[in-house]
Amino acid sequence: MCKDINFSISQGERVNICGKNGSGKSTLLKLIIGNNISHTGTVFAASNLKISYVNQDTSSLCGTLADFAENNDIDQTQFLTILRKLDFSREQFEKDIKDFSGGQKKKVLIAKSLCEQAHLYVWDEPTNFIDIFSRMQIENLLKEYQPTLLFVDHDKTFCQQVATKTINI
């Protein structure tokens, strides 16, 4: 597990948490988003901080994209616009998300996150299941939206292209 971590994130930074498998990267993200996980030490976050989280797990996603947008209280037009930028065809808008590939499901979570008005975006393995072309599309979206981002990812190229700061644990 990780030990003696101290860092801050300024507005507009994209911070990559690096470490070996099992080093506590995902656990750290879960602590930051407020999950009740047994730990020692203190996690400080600004009061009224709004966080948008992209989980590693996409297995529970189902329903149409319109239903998903409504259930998550996000603007459907903006959501679908972002998905179009991630190479979704109009035919996919009518399909059940449970039938999407792992990469398509991850894109759904990323698009949802970018639709949320948050101070901090916390993404756990955003390029999991994502091919190179899709990774580049996500990089372009991050340049366009410029969110303050804390993320964990094992794709070194993505990390080099996106991160403005790296924290090794």
Show which residues each predicted segment covers.
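ABC ATP-binding cassette signature C-motif
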Residues: 1-169
